[in-house]
Amino acid sequence: MTELHLWLRHEPRTTERRTPVVPSDARRLVENGVTLTVEESPQRIFPIEEYEAVGARVAPAGSWVSAPRNTVILGLKELPDEPKELTHRHIFFGHAYKGQPGASDLLRRFGAGGGALLDLEYLVDENGRRLAAFGFWAGYLGAALAVLQHRGRLVAPLTPTSKEELDKTLQPAAGDEEFSALVIGALGRSGRGARVAFSTAGIEPTCWDLPETQNLDRPALLTHDVLVNCVLATTPVPPFLREPDLDDPTRRLRTVSDVTCDVGSPLNVLPVYDRTTEWDDPVRQLSDRPPLDLIAIDNLPSLLPRESSTDFSAALLPQLLEFETGGAWGRCLDLFRTKSRELGIAVGEGELGHV
Ligand SMILES: NC(=O)c1ccc[n+]([C@@H]2O[C@H](COP(=O)([O-])OP(=O)(O)OC[C@H]3O[C@@H](n4cnc5c(N)ncnc54)[C@H](O)[C@@H]3O)[C@@H](O)[C@H]2O)c1
């Protein structure tokens, strides 16, 4: 019987309605002997009563700070700024290993408290393949928003919705002009999502992945009306779009949706803009000669909180059930220690179960 005590925390970011564990999977955890505490949260897409009904304990929002030390705290996005010393093991997306703003501060908080970050982005199998990710829904939404913008039907501000409602808006209407679309990174998780959304909208996109961009045919790229970029770049490659392409009078391309959102990174394949767009103002015009609109939203799956949480939770559940023995968590812990030490931060040597 596992002794794992898992604590599902409230997300401080007010627009974040997703959760890494949905009530039906909470039931499976409890049935398998996990002690599960779930914090109340005003915005989580699943009400607290659904967790309580499957045997979870309920705690106030933010009360993880005083949870017993051996509790594993589970969330998705950033922690609040306090406490300064983090004593627990935390599972979430830390964004702390690529020199991001605030990365070293976060690792120092773990170092100071003796806790550990088990970063969901690096929860991988022995071949380095991600075990739980939101990519499919990112691509689905990236393509859906591009379709709506291109058809003149994108309504701002964007608000979280359901797939059913979104799909209704994607149906082609009388008078809609046909257009061509290109998905790059089409074989990945988000690329697959983008293809499914296009299909719902009645569009058959051109699909490119690594082989098709090896000798990039930029003129061919520019003959598409809509581009959805879904690549996961790991080494620098020639950009898909450059500043001069914006002024190219022969360009057909009118709408770009950048799911990847590597803005500011040396790996950015779309270095033609300098900041992401937001739910309040999702589209920015990059050029008016001829027009080119950009959508670059870096929290797309949050727009479909129920569907994206349900898929993510289903992928995470088997890993949580193997928390004490699972090699994937051991790899997360090793990486946390390596990255902390690279910054000169002292970290403990405890086993996964007793950090
Ligand atoms: N905007 C958002 O809200 C959001 C959410 C989740 C993920 N993402 C980002 O989306 C990107 C893709 O994530 P994923 O989960 O789909 O990754 P993935 O690894 O499943 O797929 C990436 C695909 O890109 C392809 N690729 C890599 N380099 C390429 C190149 N130069 N040319 C053509 N194809 C190339 C790969 O072969 C692969 O098929 C990541 O950068 C991820 O951080 C964004």
Where does each model-flagged region fall?
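Short glycine-/small-residue-rich Rossmann-like dinucleotide-binding loops
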Residues: 77-78, 94-95, 231-236, 260-261, ...
